[in-house]
Amino acid sequence: MSVAQTATSVDGDGNLRRTDVRNIAIIAHVDHGKTSLVDCLIRQSGVFRENQQMQTCLLDSNDLERERGITILAKNIAMMWNGVRINIIDTPGHADFGGEVERVLRMADGALLLVDAFEGPRPQTRFVLQKALQCGLALMVVINKIDRPDCRPDEVLSQTFDLLVELGADDKTLDFPYIYTSAREGYATHDPAQKGGDIRPLLDLVLEKIPGPIVRPDDPLQLMVTSLEWSRYVGRIATGRIAAGRIRTGQQVAVMRSNGAKTMAKVEQVQLYDNLGRSNTAEASA
């Protein structure tokens, strides 16, 4: 029996879904705590051993991003939680990078909408959130910075609901799960009056509320490429999501371009996102 067969189940609509994977995008306005939250998730999920040092602000690695405090090129981070691989996909937050936003969101099945417990939803949040709704992503709201003395989490939750109504969200989306966090203090809670603890309630809610990806493991290979890189050592690197079939080292594949042209290529190497980097694997499947 293949790994794909043992890690799938049929949902209520008859779709075959992976049960051991969650693909989530994080949507947030500048300074609402996205980088701090991801740092916290990585620390507490066991990516690093206790004696390891970790540079903060993991997602803001591009020089321009460090200078301006924004995210332009999305990064992917993978972590394991209770036997499930959680792929975290960071999203550009500005309308200027709309093409990048759409490509990134198509990698995800759900989105964490991160909102400051004092400021509430901001214009930057609105743009990416609208794109996420258009992609049909399952939504989960995270009200962050509840450790602030001036926080107003209940009002901000209501503002978030109103924003979703304005954007035309359906009834299912409006019944979104939500949780409160302090990324700086490292905890999540279902009750904003309850301070302290750890981030585990957030990770548990992700596994419970965000669906695994719909897959077709026995169909011919289909891989949606979302970004291309060039390495002087291995050549062109395509990053994307496998919707159907399998991809193996040494496999001959057809590369379909946007204009309909088709070229043949050989897969020299297959890698998966693994914690903060990538690891080689002989095969990957939908």
Annotate the PLM regions.
Residues 11-12, 61, 75-76, 98-101, ...:
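Short beta-alpha junctions and helix-cap segments that line functional grooves
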